[in-house]
Amino acid sequence: MFMKSNAVPSSYVTLRPRYIPYWPLWLGLAACVVAMVWSSFIVPVIPDFACLSTIGLDGLALAMAVMVMPRHFVIGFLASLLPFMISWRVAAIHGSVPGMATSTVAFMIYLMLYVDCMVHDRAAGWNDHLQWQTATIRIYFGFDMVGHFAEKLFAGVHSFHHMEQVFVGFGFPPDGQAVIAGGLCELSVAIGVGMGVLTRLAGIGGALYYLIANHYGRHFGDGFTWNNAPVGGWEYPMLMIVAFASFAIAGAGKFSIDGWLIAHGWMPRFLLPLCVSDACTHVQRDARRSA
């Protein structure tokens, strides 16, 4: 362990918003739940199990925001943001205007909380500024996978069967197993990279997944530029591969599940190489201050 688990890591004291309260997000997420109920049962545009996905995921996001975020901002923020993003994506797939509108407002509140937290932490020094740069890029690239796995796993029967036919075009059998496997891989990358859970392992996994997926997508045979005919070149796939692989170098940084667990001394030692290349700088600094 890097430090005693009952100590409060000093670098995490400032990792919370200073000016933006939590209650606007609670109201925003509650409005999202109401909007998803409306679009599922009152004016039903969200079909079959997708209605359970949107309502349940927004409910989970609200629970994390209310019960966890005020006490442990990093954990609560990341654990709330991912299910919210999935629900937002499913609402957009099915054209739920109330769902998209309320989700847009809620997302702006998430963004304000994140920026407020970053500004609150600004006195930490240039190294921590780089940590915020890394965190922003990591969260974006990790949660970019939401747009891919949501339509495979959470958007309903019609969306699943559509993706099943897409995978048939890639040469897979029409049994849906490849759709489920691909969706679970993408969900794992979103959790691992976006939330920062075993980030080095997730970065390697994400890079390998994109390498394999885009082999089947035949992008590597269409040149470099993404808008090349017929399916687009390898510009975008290579961007994703390099981005994911880069997180295998040093891990996620402090605004992550890995960073939080390591700083509190709760990450098992045998998992540390899958999270960070060495003791994080903010963990080393906290250890010196607590000595």
Question: Over which residues does each language-model region extend?
Answer:
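Membrane-interface interhelical connector segments
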Residues: L153-A178
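Core segments of transmembrane alpha-helices
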Residues: C185-A190, M240
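Extended, low-polarity transmembrane helix blocks
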Residues: F2-F154, G176, I180, L198-A291
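Glycine- and acidic-residue-biased ligand/ion/polar-headgroup-sensing regions
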Residues: F149, A190-I191
